[in-house]
Amino acid sequence: PYRRQRQMCIRDSSKGMSIEAEVGSIGGVEDGVVGNGEIADPAECAKITDLGIDFLAAGIGNIHGVYPANWKGLDFEALDRIHKATNNIPLVLHGGTGIPDDMIAKAISLGVSKININTECQLVFAEATRKYIEEGKDQQGKGFDPRKLLAPGAKAIEAKCKEKIELFGCAGKG
């Protein structure tokens, strides 16, 4: 049933492209799709891995966007089963924003090698840009120039990424 996808993986990887697949429903709200943070089936993950993908993102209770107060956390037993079922393919954690540092560290120890934190970057960008405007800096000189107006947000994203690089243990790695 995955013949077409397999052909795409072969074609794309032959052109030097990395292929990441998402299995199961990653919860949260993204592009109008709402999910609750389901747990992916390790057998399905193994089938998808056999297509020739390079990275696998699987639902382990994670969600896109901001986590609600009643979030139950990541399912590390499921993560371990998925990692073993997929022959140690590099795993991706979608919805990394707001996951406690200790959970991130444990996920990395169980095979996660890429963590998406887009929402976190968007939030710090918005906060820094809002502060710039609320302080009236957009009204001073040419503070309305988009390069000046957006600079605090860009710097906030840079600072957040540096913080996460340290947390994820990536500093100094190629």
Regions found by a protein language model. Give the residues of each.
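Active-site beta-loop-alpha junctions enriched in small/polar residues
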Residues: 22-32, 59-63, 94-98, 118-122
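Catalytic cores of alpha/beta
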Residues: 96-110
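Extended, intrinsically disordered, low-complexity segments
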Residues: 133-174
